């Protein structure tokens, strides 16, 4: 395909920065290319100043909408956002930019469904859990979450990763959270925060681990190379 026929991808990033860099690396790795010009054009706003997506009234939605509008103005034709929780603002982002957004929550839920699971364990913050509960329920699946005290411990683990700690003890902590979900009846796991796969791989857990960020990178390549259709544009 001629580079002129490819779609330009706009990335709303920085939530967190390491997860965005990981996403961009996957995007590059999954693009078949013999030369630089074969790669997808990507316009990224890596904005770690976006307000906390879990804090009501933080203004995160308006900041994300502004970022999306700027990406459109810079030439983006389709959007991706490697942050699960920020998808709570997906409709606002699409309306503000006039661009379709490739939905990583939908990709994660659909992957779990295709594996035949009925009970899905999600390693995510409260915002991500809410989103996945809705998307899974739409597919007649139920979400398995950590008990309150361990959910707090998970958040502590998550912020260690955000602070740059990718050590073995952090991996062991994340394995412990994953094992608790298995014991509570989960049949498959979803990495519901993009930091989780930075320390946890499929071989680290006893259940299959769905990585929505990886699925998002693969779908972005497929859409931008026109192997798959664009998502529905906002009304």
Show which residues each predicted segment covers.
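Non-catalytic structural scaffold of enzyme domains
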Residues: 1-235
């Amino acid at each position: 395909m001629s580079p002129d026929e490819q779609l330009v991808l706009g990335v709303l990033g920085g939530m967190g920065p390491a997860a965005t860099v990981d996403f961009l690396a996957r995007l590059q790795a999954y693009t078949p290319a013999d030369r630089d010009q074969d790669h997808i054009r990507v316009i990224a706003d890596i904005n770690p100043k976006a307000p906390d997506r879990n804090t009501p009234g933080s203004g995160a939605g308006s900041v994300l909408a502004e970022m999306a509008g700027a990406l459109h103005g810079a030439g983006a034709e389709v959007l991706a956002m490697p942050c699960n929780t920020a998808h709570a603002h997906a409709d606002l982002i699409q309306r503000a930019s006039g661009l379709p957004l490739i939905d990583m929550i939908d990709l994660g839920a659909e992957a779990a469904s295709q594996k035949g699971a009925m009970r899905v364990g999600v390693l995510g913050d409260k915002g991500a859990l809410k989103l996945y509960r809705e998307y899974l329920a739409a597919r007649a699946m139920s979400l398995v979450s950590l008990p309150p005290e361990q959910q707090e411990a998970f958040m502590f683990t998550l912020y260690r990763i955000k602070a740059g700690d990718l050590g073995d003890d952090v991996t062991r902590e994340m394995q412990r959270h994953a094992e608790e979900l298995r014991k509570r009846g989960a049949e498959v796991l979803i990495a519901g925060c993009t930091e989780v796969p930075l320390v946890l791989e499929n071989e680290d857990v006893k259940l299959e681990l769905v990585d929505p960020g990886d699925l998002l990178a693969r779908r972005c390549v497929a859409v931008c190379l026109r192997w798959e259709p664009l998502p529905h544009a906002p009304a």
